[in-house]
């Protein structure tokens, strides 16, 4: 997956820009799309708003940050967007909302981040988690950010997005399927370039190993 962003820093903690992301979809014969998305963010002393995520810092110092957060879970499925006749018989899956905690430890050794969130929009009430380590490397105007991590999703969330119910199996001809808990390791690399005092640009790639 990759993303590009250009942002203009405003006063009072505000920033704005435009970004885009693209990722191969795990659904069979599915149309993958990338759309430009305007982004707005605000960084206050305690409250922040970063695109589809809102947070409030409970602890914030040079070495550690702990926040309570609510954000969009950016996964969905539209049966009509699949070219496979059987998959087109499945029910749609919508975006979800999740809420929980984000934690981040930082120092000269890099940054260690962790999160745990629960789905609250009526899509099974599943739990997701993430643990990752990153080490920013400064080279002139460019900052490289390699990251290694692992994501967790429980059976309830996986079943909503990837399961095949008995009713769906009956009308599609697919086998009924109920996934379990999953761990998904990933690697990513991002590069951020400071163009001038007001503008910066960022691009990144990420690879994940999906569970069977």
Name what the model sees in each region:
Residues 12, 32-38, 62, 93-99, ...:
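Residues that define the transmembrane beta-barrel architecture of outer-membrane proteins
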Residues 40-45, 59, 104-108, 136-138, ...:
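Structural signature of outer-membrane beta-barrel channels/translocons
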